[in-house]
Amino acid sequence: MRKNENIENIEGKIYQFDLKEKVTGENSKNPGTPYIAGTVEVAVDAEASNIVPVHYTYVAPTYSSGKSNNTYTALKQIITSGKTVVTDGYDMATCVKLNPSYSVNDWYPQGQETVQTTPRNEGGFVNIVTPDTLRPEGDIGRHKFSVDVIIFEVTEITPDEGDSYVQIKGITFDFRNAALPITMVARNAAAAKYFLDLEASKKNPVYTKVWGKIVNTYIKSEKVTESAFGEATVDTIVRRNREYLITGANPVPYEFDTEGTITAAELSKVLQDREVHLAEVKKNSEEYNASKNAKSASPAAQAATASVPQGGFSF
């Protein structure tokens, strides 16, 4: 199985951040190791109309080789002296260039059997820069993604408001070649037609490279509650709309089921591995909830071991 592309580039001013310095516990592989975890939100334009969050799960001061980790140093600097759009204004906010990858966060809400999977921009290098080194506003390079993807579903969506668009579902891969579900959209008419014409399905997956821009906007609306007396109550509701908007694709898709790309057997294996991962997530969630409620842990979720039949991939 070839190495698959999964890269992002995020540039702009720090909108706000939630970074914390922590120490690994006694049951970890390296107990007592300091690390930083949390999120940096980047405003890619002066109006802060597109705010892209990047998550950091574990950033230690050094690599396993003992070499200093510059990403840790940069995140530490943000914690101690970083300025944000929220507290200091756009002009004074710290400028950054981030190089995360597309990832997902899998979790099971307590008491529910269905996994929740949300997209996440994860990890990568962090560089604190000067304003003159940023790409111009409007440049797609400020919020770009590029991924190799196996497409298995393309659906035309007609919303109640706004123009029709096409939704593209598939899987991409992390640096370990683990499968990551991804949902993208195409709003350009030519792009929409291109993806619909692929006739991609679970029995006829299409393996290709796509790229585009990460659009993360916040939509505000008001809910008015009338009162029998006195003034009505007005609540502001903020809804986040996140899109991976495709702006380009390879002219010719990769060949599928070949040794030089990915074979049907390899695809079946990575999909099976994801089922095992989700079973482990469920097991950990159940054990955590049980310990939190001071009850005995429920039986561990069984990992999926059945093979995925060729030509009928279980996405």
Regions found by a protein language model. Give the residues of each.
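OB-fold and OB-like single-stranded nucleic-acid-recognition modules
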Residues: M1-F315
